[in-house]
Amino acid sequence: IGIEVMREAVRVLETLEHKHALPLEFVMFDWGAEKYLREGVSLPPDALEMLRREFDAILIGALGDPRVPTNQHAVDILLGIRFGLDLYVNQRPVKLYDARLCPLKGRNELDLNFVIFRENTEGAYVGAGGMLRQGTDGEVAIQEDVNTRLGVERILVHAFEYARGRGLKKLCMSDKSNALAFGHGLWQRTFREVRERYLKIESRHLYVDALAMEMLRDPSQFEVIVTCNMFGDILSDLGAQLAGGLGLTPSANIHPGKT
């Protein structure tokens, strides 16, 4: 759906450009499945430096094509840009525009309006790990989950600053520290320290399984949610479905002050 989504997204931006006199300049690139299948190239060698030097924002449609079973082009583009430009904030607003789109019974537009902040450069998605005795009955697969104090603190601070800047009163941090004692223990300790800087915001913690249940039971209780990479990936898609589907829920990958 990438091409179709992009076509409509550009129409919206062009409307905003004319309505609000925004000085937008669009440059289109053919990066996607067609280019990958034709040339075997996902991103040109100088793509990241060119994007960093010449552009303020990057608009990407949905990536994926059954002709590329491994989705290698999508991995190269999304993760290449995300890690290459250190886009550590993934911001996923969840807003219901029409009650008929929500699968939950008796919910209306006022019940579903929150934002999920997902740490975007660490966790289980860094690609660290390996295989032992591959192809044997004793095969072992190891996938490492990497969390740093810098990475955890900066996404927590960004979420709190977002809440404060918009006059929001409630923030929920989610992890699984009862089972992932080391990595998510770091999330717990850092959260307790950072929340002391924002005492006017009602902040609380929920384990991710409890949070998923609460999002279904009463989504109106949430304003800002912040969590790790993998949990944010899952929860934001759950939120998207509550709002009517992925086609209605945008996603922004951000390095505040840069991209």
Segments (PLM) and residue ranges:
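Glycine-rich phosphate/diphosphate-binding loop of Rossmann-like nucleotide-binding domains
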Residues: I1-R11, T15-K19, T136-D209, Q221
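Glycine-rich phosphate/nucleotide-binding loop
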Residues: E214-T259
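Short coil/turn connectors at secondary-structure junctions
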Residues: L22-L24, R53-A57, D86-L87, E109-N113, ...
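N-terminal beta-loop-helix "entrance" segment that forms/cooperates
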Residues: K19-P45, M213-M215
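Short acidic loop-to-helix transition motifs that present clustered carboxylates
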Residues: A99, L206-M213
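Short, small-residue-enriched loops and turns at beta-alpha junctions
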Residues: P66-R67, N178-F182, M213-E214
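N-terminal glycine-rich phosphate/adenylate-binding segment common to multiple enzyme folds
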Residues: K35-I142, M230-G232
